[in-house]
């Protein structure tokens, strides 16, 4: 892949040469008061001979009323040369200028241009902006179609892909395709749509890719150049038009601490001062939310101001507004906004302006919808200059809040991180109410990429000299963690490609479609191929390291090592049987002495003894646990139901992020007597001894005395007088007896093994283990190389084709059948289950309202713990859906597609069936909300998505001549498409 790199600094300039600043990541940033530089690179396909740059005498397609930045003028030169370009720059840097020029150029040349964005809200905004500027502009989002024959079409990426598969006439005419927010390609669910669209784009079209800063922009451009056999330029800038200052606001404190200045220098002394200013909150004063301490909102005692109130007050006093305060939950967003109830930020004139704009916006709503609690409750806080923005809001309210924010009538906006995507709404200040977030699996620190994306909203170009970012910190944080978050690099643009049945069927149905070709040309395959030389280098290095480890009597030692592993595995099996709740619960009595395993595999080196390290303690009680802890990865599903509180000897320390860490240690070692909660799997044995210890164990002396009694027991009986599983606990399990016999046989082998008494055996075993680990790494890397050199997803592709043949979607010759034609049209829901239901006759037999209710299970993904069971007729339909889903999943499993059958079946949720049924029956939205008990915006999004699915089913029914079903589905659309749920966007 050819590459030419040049700095975009005009040599003819009379200005002083730009100053280079070496940053911590070794990259060079060019800074100059008059001219700020960028890196311009270009990727060529193999064997491509670049043409000499043409000299343009023709006037520019568009003039701008301001001086262009270097990166903008460099990108525009590429467009004038008729070549594709990727522009990678920070939020609010001015990437839209390049898109605007591409549109102007296309319209001037009478060419077709398509602008795509990841979200409908952004498409609506861009449509309004481009319509005002160019007039010949249309919009296609799935919800709305306006002037589809316009020369410039604004659409979502999903609509573009759909047009490509259908062989739309527009695709044959398009000269330029603009992909905005192309870094969305790494999204695990929707990112694949970008890859498909780019691969399938017409070969004679050119591209404009607009992206946030990504470190591997060159790799992406290399891929585009290879797939489309055309040059692709990269114009990359790290420059922020408005530099940022980063502050810490410690919980309970009163001041701001500058930790990173506008020159990106990290002030460690200031950071430490901010942590020292943290006011520790008493356990009783901490506000809890589902057992977790809420972040970012330390509530003062009665009469005191909360931290959030103090901070916003300070921001307003220092004229740092407008401010966006990011939170990671919809409920917390609203709770924080409510803490501002006494704060008034707008003048009387501004309040009147808010009321006028708000009244005008909701004028299209019915009188009933105007009385919705969310509508009536939000106006008072908006008038005070405070707003809330999250996905649970009614879409019309989200838009009116965006408009008020743009007009400067909202000074303080509480928003979730979705506000940082695409929408051009910068503020002077951005506040992070929390620096930790729950990612669906565990609580973790924000990544540098997430921080960069959200902090990019700070600083308004041409208005603010600098933008301000404030982190609210309420727990100790290591400087290294803070530095990596505040000064780390952006997230790489990595492929999230995955196969789907809809993709596969559309590829087989297309005249020029070829699933293998799509896989071969995917960014995923490109990245896999790229990694091979580096992997081979790693393998060679590891093989050299492996060969350098020479061990005496290696085979005999390996045999002994394997015996140790077998022994430990059998001991573990025995413990799992003995400590299943049905056997052990009757014996988990308070004050019983208990032996615990205190070997920690994550921290301790591998033990080569057949005995693990253990400690002793006293049982306090056992607990029934409802579900796995959100942030405890060590707890295993099989013992998730019970934990045991044990008083034992512990080492108490702080971990890398300042959190208290408690680890059980052998009872004779130094440490504190602490009550810890352990899973059943950590218990090694139960003693028959019940200790006589005081009830009040709060005093340290009482706890020390309790452990002293355990030590006295062990001095008399070193094994602690364990309960015998068979005699005392009455375990009659045949698998237990069988495992015990195998363990005894192994113990005999240990005694007889010739190497057991060999000198330095532990050191030899350590070397052997190192060698075994190297062998395992080499094997894993070789497997990766083999799978990389083969076509990615090749086995999965074969398996999915088997599924489609088994279910009757394609013939043995890969010709798409009737069922397959239906599934081709369904891209907004699980296509196989929906098609199977359609062909089973359920859609024909069900009433229209029941059909709509059933479809809600395909679009609702949130799990509502207190959702009521739907009425009998709806529940019967849901059971049929589950049966169909199970059958589809089991066929996939039989055909070797990796799938968890139960998880797949459980992914269809009945939680809003009743609410949607009521909506289809004609109920008012406020009545439906009383049934649903979810955020209004979440329900509206689900119903709109459902309408999308219905439209796809209408096209599917039409394609197979099912006119009766088509009419029924159209009736379903007419029943749900009304009132506030489908209120028109304010941007249109």
Swiss-Prot record:
EC number of this enzyme: 3.6.4.13
Record keyword Aminoacyl-tRNA synthetase present: no
SUPFAM superfamilies xrefs: P-loop containing nucleoside triphosphate hydrolases (SSF52540)
Classification via SMART domains: DEXDc (SM00487), DSHCT (SM01142), HELICc (SM00490)
Keyword Zinc: no
GO biological process: RNA catabolic process; rRNA 3'-end processing; rRNA processing
Sequence segments annotated as region (Disordered): 1-27
Domain Helicase ATP-binding: 76-232
Knockout mutant characteristics: Slower embryogenesis and several developmental defects including aberrant vein patterning, pointed first and second leaves, smaller rosettes and shorter roots.
Cellular component aspect of the GO annotation: nucleolus; nucleoplasm; nucleus
Pfam families associated with the record: DEAD, DSHCT, Helicase_C, MTR4-like_stalk, MTR4_beta-barrel
Secretion signal, residue range per the UniProt entry: none
GO MF annotation, one: ATP hydrolysis activity
Binding-site residues, ATP: 89-96
Tissue expression remark: Ubiquitous but preferentially expressed in active tissues.
Motif segment (DEVH box): 180-183
Name listed for the protein in its UniProt record: DExH-box ATP-dependent RNA helicase DExH9
Gene: MTR4
